[in-house]
């Protein structure tokens, strides 16, 4: 409240509420978040709850995690409980944070938990995650129609690394799986054909109706655009470029954050406008944007955070430009590193 924040987005830990993923809930876990909500409201700070930000109960992971369709039932029960306990005080719920990240890096590339490189399980994840969102949406709305519900997606314009046909085709594939595997079914009611052809056997009757709810908003996380290169070793045949490859294209000393992410404000504007134009001009919450830079305390005991200030200025100008061009931006949340 001292820095006049109007809203605070936080994640609830599923294992903290249901240590086994299901069954009896943990009252101490519920009480912790209840106290947090009460304190936020005392300070007139609007809470935004994210139900899943990658911490999965181990017993559910032992049964296949997101690759097992049964997870949709457990996530629905968890979502319902949170809505019952907190829906009187929190009116903005985000079901899932960055499905493309935890599915791709967890089940296809093996960078994140559970560390798998399994294309079949990855494809199952896509459909199960979409279903989980749809079921959770319905369960939350059954508690109160006044609760606003959406999903936060990590999206970015994709660029082919070169003009070769291989890289151009790789870019199309990567862009489809990264940017549209979740947004299209959730907000348009259908999968892109390249994905539908691969998961048709997983889609049961009424699945698409469950997935395609009347979402109240889209949450957008954005940090950089993506340069895509063809790679036969990757299970999709496409991947984002590494730092060595990137250095051949740009001056990495001037155009990267300390996490080696490109600084391209125009990409932010383009992604916001893509949401506006492709998904029928939805309400958009900009749920994450920010940068990582080294902080140094000077002789006066201050941090002259010039790079971060300049980054935020440029990206907020991109947001303002999108608003002037009709995008319905409802909030902007800085992600601090």
Where are these regions (language model features)?
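Active-site-adjacent substrate/metal-binding segments within catalytic domains
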Residues: 1-33
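Active-site region of glycoside hydrolase catalytic domains
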Residues: 20, 30, 34-337
């Amino acid at each position: 409240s001292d820095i006049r924040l109007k809203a605070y987005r936080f994640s609830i830990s599923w294992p903290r509420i249901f240590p086994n993923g299901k069954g009896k809930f943990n009252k101490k876990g519920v009480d912790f978040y209840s106290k947090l909500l009460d304190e936020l409201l005392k300070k007139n700070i609007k809470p935004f709850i994210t139900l899943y930000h990658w911490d999965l109960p181990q017993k559910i992971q032992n049964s296949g995690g997101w690759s097992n369709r049964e997870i949709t039932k457990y996530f629905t029960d968890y979502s319902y409980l949170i809505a019952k306990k907190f829906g009187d005080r929190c009116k903005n719920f985000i079901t899932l944070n960055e499905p493309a990240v935890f599915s791709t890096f967890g089940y296809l590339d093996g960078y994140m938990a559970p560390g798998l490189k399994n294309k079949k399980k990855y494809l199952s994840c896509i459909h199960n995650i979409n279903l989980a969102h749809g079921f959770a949406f319905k369960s939350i709305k059954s508690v109160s129609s006044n609760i606003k519900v959406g999903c936060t997606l990590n999206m970015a314009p994709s660029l082919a690394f070169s003009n070769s046909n291989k890289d151009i085709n790789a870019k199309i594939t990567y862009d489809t799986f990264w940017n549209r595997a979740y947004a299209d079914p959730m907000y348009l009611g259908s999968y892109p054909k390249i994905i539908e052809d691969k998961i048709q056997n997983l889609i049961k009757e009424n699945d698409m109706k469950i997935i395609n709810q009347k979402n109240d908003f889209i949450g957008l996380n954005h940090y950089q655009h993506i340069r895509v290169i063809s790679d036969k070793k990757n299970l999709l045949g496409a991947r984002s470029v590494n730092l060595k490859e990137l250095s051949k294209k740009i001056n990495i000393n001037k155009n990267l954050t300390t996490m080696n992410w490109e600084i391209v404000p125009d990409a932010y504007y383009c992604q916001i406008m893509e949401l506006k134009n492709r998904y029928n001009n939805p309400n958009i919450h900009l749920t994450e944007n920010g940068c990582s830079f080294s902080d140094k305390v000077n002789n006066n005991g201050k941090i002259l955070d010039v790079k971060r200030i300049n980054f935020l200025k440029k990206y907020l100008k991109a947001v303002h430009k999108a608003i002037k061009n009709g995008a319905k931006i409802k909030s902007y949340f800085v992600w601090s590193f």
